[in-house]
UniProtKB/Swiss-Prot annotation:
InterPro entries: K+_transporter, K_trans_C, K_trans_N. Its main location: membrane. The chain crosses the membrane at residues 22-42, 60-80, 152-172, 192-212, 216-236, 265-285, 293-313, 344-364, 392-412, 423-443, 452-472, 477-497. Belongs to the HAK/KUP transporter (TC 2.A.72.3) family. It is a multi-pass membrane protein. This is Probable potassium transporter 9. GO terms for molecular function: potassium ion transmembrane transporter activity. Glycans are attached at residues 325, 420. GO terms for cellular component: membrane.
Length: 788
C-alpha cells in the first residue's frame, strides 16, 4: 500500500519500538476487550435461526468461512489498513472524520466560524500544491445546504448507534459470559440464576464509573491478554483433538455452499455472523489514546490470530458433535473441556466486564463530543483522573445506560434477541464510517473519485448485505436500536436546530458598538468596581442580553469582557492558541472581547484556572497592543491618531496561557518585533507567576506595575492598574437565561419541536452555568426571550 495513503499526505512519525510495544500491550485492555469476547456469542446467535447442524458440516464450515473472511476484510483490511489512516491529528472516530471533511470543505454548520480558526496548528491543511483545490464533490457540498444537513444527519445516526451499542454491548457481553453456568446447573437453576447474576454485575459495573477506572485500569490489559491466550490454547486443543482438517473451511467456496443449502435462513443468519466484528470500530475511536502502529501491531500479531484460532477451535469441536441438546444450543462453553470450564468462565466474565467498560467510556466520550458541537443537550461532565486526559464520567448518562442495560437483559433474556439488536447498531456505525471515509479519500487525501467509489462499493456492499440481514429481524430484537436511534436523533436534531436558530436571533438583534460607547454618566450609567464577564455566542458586536441587562440595571463593571466560548472542528486546541483577545471600543472604555476556543475532545477548565488565565491574557494583550501602536506610530512618522486603538477594535490577537509561548496577531506583522520578545519585554509592566511553565496553577494572578519605567506609557500603566484593582474587587459572570417560543402562525411540527421539545430539554438538562463551571455566588442571569 502507498505509504502516503492518508494522513493528509504527511509522513508518519516513527515511534521507538519499545514505546510501540508498550502502547500495543495497553491497547488490549481499552481497544480490544469488546472484540475479543465476541466468540462467546457468535455461533450461538448464528444458529439461533432455522439452521440445522447437519453431519455434512456444510453449515458450521460455511459459518466459519464467513467469520474468517469477515474478520479479514473488515477489521484487518478496512480498519487497520485504511480507516486508521484517516485520523484527525491522531484522533479517530465518527467526529474525527466529520471534522476532517468540515475543514477541507466549507460544510460545517457551526454558526460562529472565524478565519482566525484556520490558523490553528491543528487546523492547518497539508496537501501537495499541485493538487487542485476544487473538486465537483466539494463544490456540491459547499453549494447545497441540504447536502450539508444530510451529512450532519448521517453523523448523528452513527453517534446514536454508538450510544445504542453502549446499551446493548454490556448486556450481551456479560449475559453471554454468565450463561456458561447453564452447563453446570439444572434448567430451573439456570433460569433463576443467570439473569440475576448478570444484573448484579451490570449494577456493579456502572456504580464504579463514578470513581473512574484509573485505579484498576492497569488490570485491563492483563485480563484481555490472558483471555486471548486462553482462547488460542483452547482453539488449538480443539483443532488438534477433534478435527485438524477444519482449516479447509477457510476456502470461500464454503460460503457459497452454505448459502445454497440454507437459502433465506442462511441469509438471515448473517445477522449473527456480523457480531464477530463487534468492537472493530473501537480501534478507530480510541486511536487518540494510542497510536496507529500500536493498534496495528496488537491486532495483526495477537488479536486477529487468537480470534481465528478461537473460532476454528469451536468449529472443529462442533464438526464432531451433531446431536447437542437444544437446551445447551451451540455456545462457546460447550467446546471448553469440563476440567477447565470454571476458570474459563471466571476469566470470560472478567473479560466481558473489561469490554463493557471500554464501550461505556466510549459512549461518554462521544456524547461529550456531540455536546461540544451543539448536537446534544448540556450534561455534566466529570473528569475522573487528573493525569489521564479524556477519562470522563457523565452521571445522568451513566445511570440511564444502567437502567436500559438491565431492561434489555431482563426483557430479552436470550442471546438471540440481544445479538439481533447489537448487530444492527454495529453494522450501522460501520456503514456511516464507510461513507465518511469515502469522502475523506476524495476531499482530504485528494485521491481519485474512482478510488473512493471502489472503496465505497467494495466495503459498502459487504456491510449492506449484513445490514439487510439484521434489519429483517426487526421484530426479533432489531427494533430496539432503531427506537433508541429515533429518540436520540429527535433530541439531537431539535437541540442543534434550535441552537442555530437562537444564534441567528442573537446575530440579528445584537446592538451596535456606538450604542455601547454612548453609555455614560450623562445617561445615569454607573461603572462599578470589578470585572464583568458577559457570555455570548457572538464573536462580534454587543449581545442583546447585555443591552437588556443595562436597561434593567443601569450599571456595569469597570472592566467589561465579552466572552465567547466556542468549539472549533479540531480535536484539540493548544493552550498557547486558546485565547483570542481584542478591544471593544477605545482603550479608555476598558471593554474587551475574549474568544475561548476548544476542540471537540478538549476538557473545559475549572473556573479558578479559567479566570486566572483570562485576566492574564488581558494583561498580555494590553502590553502587545501598546507595543503594536508604538511601532506603528514610529513607522508612520510623527503623525499619530487619537482613535488608533479604536480602529483596531476588530483585530484579535492570540494570547497563550503562558506568555513565554508563541503569540500571533491576525493582522499583518509589519512592526518587525517578535511577539515572543514583546511578551517578555524588560519594561516590567506585568509579572504573571501563575503562568510559569513548570509552576502549578494558582487561583490568583498578581500584577506588578512599575510606573517609574521610562518605556511604559502612562495610559498602559493606568489600564493595567485598573485591571489589577478590578481583579481584586471580584468577578461577575453574566449569562443569558433563555425562554424560547415560536412565532405566531408557526406550523404544528415547529411548535412541538421548539416550543415543547426544546423547552423540555432545556428545563430538564444542565444549564450553561454548570457546563461553564460558573460559581453560583458570582452568577448573574439575564432573561432573554427568543421568538423563533
Amino acid at each position: 500500500m502507498d505509504p502516503e495513503f492518508g494522513r493528509g499526505m504527511a509522513p508518519r512519525k516513527r515511534e521507538p519500538w519499545r514505546t510501540t510495544l508498550l502502547l500495543a500491550y495497553q491497547s488490549l485492555g481499552v481497544v480490544y476487550g469488546d472484540l475479543s469476547i465476541s466468540p462467546l456469542y457468535v455461533y450461538k446467535s448464528t444458529f439461533a435461526e432455522d439452521i440445522t447442524h447437519s453431519e455434512s458440516n456444510e453449515e458450521i464450515f460455511g459459518v466459519l468461512s464467513f467469520v474468517f473472511w469477515t474478520l479479514t476484510l473488515i477489521p484487518l483490511i478496512k480498519y487497520v489498513s485504511i480507516v486508521l489512516r484517516a485520523d484527525d491529528n491522531g484522533e479517530g472516530g465518527t467526529f474525527a472524520l466529520y471534522s476532517l471533511i468540515c475543514r477541507h470543505a466549507n460544510v460545517s454548520l457551526l454558526p460562529n466560524r472565524q478565519v482566525a480558526d484556520e490558523e490553528l496548528s491543528t487546523y492547518k491543511l497539508e496537501y501537495p500544491p499541485e493538487v487542485a483545490n476544487r473538486s465537483r464533490i466539494k463544490e456540491w457540498l459547499e453549494k447545497h445546504k441540504t447536502l450539508q444537513t444530510a451529512l450532519l444527519i448521517m453523523v448523528m445516526i452513527g453517534t446514536c448507534m454508538v450510544i445504542g451499542d453502549g446499551v446493548l454491548t454490556p448486556a450481551i457481553s456479560v449475559f453471554s459470559a454468565v450463561s456458561g453456568l447453564e452447563l453446570s446447573l439444572s434448567r430451573d437453576q439456570h433460569e433463576y440464576a443467570v439473569i440475576p447474576i448478570t444484573c448484579v454485575i451490570l449494577v456493579f459495573l456502572f456504580a464504579l464509573q463514578h470513581y473512574g477506572t484509573h485505579r484498576v485500569g492497569f488490570l485491563f490489559a492483563p485480563i484481555v491478554l490472558a483471555w486471548l491466550i486462553c482462547m488460542s490454547m483452547l482453539g488449538l486443543y480443539n483443532i488438534i483433538h477433534w478435527n485438524p482438517q477444519v482449516y479447509r473451511a477457510l476456502n470461500p467456496y464454503y460460503m457459497l455452499k452454505f448459502l445454497r443449502k440454507t437459502k433465506k435462513s442462511g441469509w438471515m443468519s448473517l445477522g449473527g455472523i456480523l457480531l464477530c466484528m463487534t468492537g472493530s470500530e473501537a480501534m478507530f475511536a480510541d486511536l487518540g489514546h494510542f497510536s496507529y502502529s500500536a493498534i496495528q501491531l496488537a491486532f495483526t500479531t495477537l488479536v486477529y490470530p487468537a480470534l481465528i484460532l478461537g473460532y476454528m477451535g469451536q468449529a472443529a469441536y462442533l464438526s464432531k458433535h451433531h446431536t447437542l441438546n437444544s437446551t445447551y444450543q451451540i455456545g462457546y462453553y460447550i467446546s471448553v473441556p469440563e476440567s477447565v470450564r470454571w476458570p474459563v468462565l471466571v476469566l470470560a466474565i472478567l473479560a466481558s466486564v473489561v469490554g463493557s467498560q471500554a464501550i461505556i467510556s466510549g459512549t461518554f466520550s462521544i456524547i461529550n463530543q456531540s455536546q461540544s458541537l451543539s448536537c446534544f443537550p448540556r450534561v455534566k461532565v466529570v473528569h475522573t483522573s487528573e493525569n489521564i486526559h479524556g477519562q470522563i464520567y457523565i452521571p445522568e448518562i451513566n445511570w440511564l445506560l444502567m437502567v436500559l442495560c438491565i431492561a434489555v437483559t431482563v426483557g430479552f433474556r436470550d442471546t438471540k434477541h440481544m445479538g439481533n439488536a447489537s448487530g444492527l447498531a454495529v453494522i450501522t456505525v460501520m456503514l456511516v464510517t464507510t461513507c465518511l471515509t469515502s469522502l475523506v479519500i476524495m476531499l482530504c487525501w485528494h485521491r481519485s473519485p474512482a478510488l473512493a467509489l471502489v472503496f465505497f462499493l467494495f466495503f459498502g456492499s459487504i456491510e449492506v448485505l449484513y445490514f439487510s440481514a439484521s434489519l429483517i429481524k426487526f421484530r426479533e430484537g432489531a427494533w430496539l436500536p432503531i427506537m433508541l436511534a429515533l429518540i436520540l436523533m429527535a433530541v439531537m436534531f431539535i437541540w442543534h436546530h434550535t441552537t442555530i436558530k437562537k444564534y441567528e436571533f442573537d446575530l440579528h438583534n445584537k446592538v451596535t458598538l456606538e450604542w455601547l460607547l454612548a453609555l455614560g454618566d450623562k445617561l445615569g450609567m454607573v461603572r462599578v468596581p470589578g470585572i464583568g464577564l458577559v457570555y455570548t455566542d457572538l464573536t462580534s458586536g454587543v449581545p442583546a442580553n447585555f443591552s437588556r441587562f443595562v436597561t434593567n440595571l443601569p450599571a456595569f463593571h469597570r472592566v467589561l469582557v465579552f466572552v465567547c466560548v466556542k468549539s472549533v472542528p479540531v480535536p484539540h486546541v493548544l493552550p498557547a492558541e486558546r485565547y483570542l483577545v481584542g478591544r471593544v471600543g477605545p482603550a479608555g472604555h476598558r471593554s474587551y472581547r475574549c474568544i475561548v476556543r476548544y476542540g471537540y475532545r478538549d476538557v473545559h477548565q475549572d473556573v479558578d484556572s479559567f479566570e486566572a488565565e483570562l485576566v492574564e491574557s488581558l494583561a498580555t494583550f494590553i502590553k502587545l497592543d501598546a507595543l503594536y501602536h508604538r511601532c506603528s506610530d514610529a513607522g508612520s512618522g510623527s503623525e499619530q491618531l487619537d482613535d488608533g486603538r479604536y480602529e483596531r477594535e476588530n483585530a484579535l490577537t492570540v494570547i497563550g496561557t503562558n506568555p513565554l509561548r508563541r503569540c500571533l496577531s491576525y493582522e499583518a506583522s509589519h512592526d518587525g518585533v517578535s511577539s515572543v520578545d514583546a511578551a517578555r519585554s524588560p519594561n516590567g509592566i506585568v509579572e504573571v507567576p501563575a503562568a510559569a511553565a513548570a509552576a502549578p496553577v494558582t487561583k490568583k494572578v498578581r500584577f506588578v506595575v512599575e510606573a517609574a519605567s521610562p518605556e511604559v506609557e502612562k495610559g498602559v500603566v493606568e489600564e493595567l492598574q485598573e485591571l489589577c484593582e478590578a481583579r481584586e474587587a471580584g468577578t461577575a459572570f453574566i449569562l443569558g437565561h433563555s425562554h424560547v417560543q415560536t412565532k405566531p402562525g408557526s406550523s404544528l411540527l415547529k411548535k412541538l419541536a421548539v416550543g415543547v421539545g426544546y423547552n423540555f430539554l432545556r428545563r430538564n438538562c444542565r444549564g450553561p452555568d454548570v457546563v461553564l463551571r460558573v460559581p453560583p455566588a458570582s452568577l448573574l442571569e439575564v432573561g432573554m426571550v427568543y421568538v423563533l
